């Protein structure tokens, strides 16, 4: 997997309001899909870890800053950077651009969670190792 993780999304008709501008709740759905793609690229596809390993990664914090509107048909470039890996938390930063122009960005904190007990758990060792490998300089405090 390339570091930082990058992917593209076309802004579809259903992602927009009546004016053809991106509807912000659709952005959150797209962001969730980007997260799912990141985990799959990392080797921990949600469709396998959720039913088989019994843990998931719910979002416990999300902040977004919107700088420029996007419109139907725009190709959005998503960049996901792992900033910090805690005992059970993961802080990521999303940068979303279109043709090099910033559109919005987001900081998100996800937590490893036991899906039966609904509580935070430490990252499994192999998952922690994979996440730490996503930090360009793990000794650098972000």
Regions found by a protein language model. Give the residues of each.
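Terminal targeting signals and extreme-terminal segments of soluble enzymes
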Residues: 1-77, 83-142
